[in-house]
């Protein structure tokens, strides 16, 4: 992908992110969030799931200076479809990072997947945004745009506790997730305004 961006190949890359290697047995990936239980980061009496923070692929990709990048959620399909339409009209490498829950890996009923994809945005652990490179924005270094900011975040605790993969998290660990979210949003509001 980095090479395609460097060459500015005319391709739309969609990253389908279910926050682990779900199709091979639910192993941790660099996109697995802190505290999530996987088969390679179990949670129980002596272990607490994934101990690292989720890599921010959207910002890593944007740092390459490609023409267009975005984040999306299957819980906000209209936003996702608008971004697909936008990307379709741009020449060069485009990237859309889509959060899409997995019933088995997330430990929640299939009927709740769209709700979870909406909840992760509403509680602020996933944001909907776009990046336009210099070619599109005319601004050196490109521009970031936040597409949706909840007036007030819903409960991180409720979001995490609704999934089996986070059931072992302590109150202190949930507080850490909330503080990490708050720090990220402070950076977004400061740097993307």
Predicted regions: what is each one?
Residues 30-90:
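Conserved thiamine diphosphate
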Residues 15, 69-72, 95-99:
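Short, conserved beta-strand edge motifs with alternating hydrophobic and charged residues
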